[in-house]
A protein has these predicted regions:
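Central hydrophobic cores of alpha-helical transmembrane segments
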Residues: 17-23, 190-204
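Membrane-interface helix-boundary motifs at transmembrane edges
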Residues: 9, 183-188
Length: 214
């Protein structure tokens, strides 16, 4: 597992996935920040609002399956085409090989996406004012009372919200990484490995299952 993870973090795919996540988040927050450049700092959005805005209103979630698949799962296609998979399973066992590949894919996808969100949040906590609705009423976020973030965002400048979203992103990316790994095994093609998970998410997000089955 250690060697697999080292190869994951050294791979250009991992860094491309992390950069795509970061640029997607920045695409929303930077545009919103530049659009309010004429306003006083205390009347602009807080660091928390800018940090999570791209998740709720930007395209981050649409690209999450793509980035999760790209981080490591696509390497499975190379191992199959080069007969490396057969050699590695002969050295150990199929079960151990599957566990290592699945674990590395999940960890690689989680680290790539989580690190992008964390770096994005750090950047905006340096540039913008931390979330403090008591001092700055404009920092108030109107979450629904049933939402878990309703009371959390006022605690320690929204730290519980940052932590929960970070864990949620990592868990979601891990799930999509396993889906992509399964695609890579059944259909050993890099393009399909990254596009099929994205397509499945698009169908799920569009409520296609509800449309057909009610």
């Amino acid at each position: 597992m250690g060697e697999e993870l080292r190869n994951t973090f050294r791979s250009s795919r991992f860094w491309i996935a992390a950069c795509v996540c970061l640029f997607t988040l920045m695409g929303y927050s930077a545009a919103y920040w530049i659009g309010s450049v004429d306003e006083w700092l205390e009347y602009r959005e807080s660091a928390l609002q800018l940090s999570i805005g791209g998740i709720f209103f930007g395209g981050f979630m649409l690209l999450l399956p793509f980035c999760a698949a790209l981080a490591h799962s696509t390497s499975q296609v190379e191992e199959e085409s080069g007969s490396i998979m057969q050699w590695r399973t002969l050295r150990s066992s199929v079960a151990k090989y599957v566990a290592i590949k699945a674990g590395a894919s999940m960890i690689g996808a989680a680290v790539a996406t989580m690190s992008a969100f964390i770096l994005h949040a750090i950047i905006w906590n340096i540039i913008a004012l931390p979330c403090d609705p008591t001092t700055y009423p404009n920092h108030t976020i109107y979450f629904d009372p049933s939402c878990i973030f309703y009371n959390w965002y006022t605690i320690c400048y929204g730290l519980p919200v940052y932590l929960e979203i970070t864990v949620g992103i990592g868990f979601t990316a891990s799930v999509w990484a396993v889906v992509a790994l399964a695609v890579a095994v059944w259909i050993p093609d890099k393009l399909l490995t990254v596009t099929i998970p994205s397509f499945l998410y698009y169908l799920w997000n569009a409520d296609v299952i509800f449309f057909f089955f009610g």
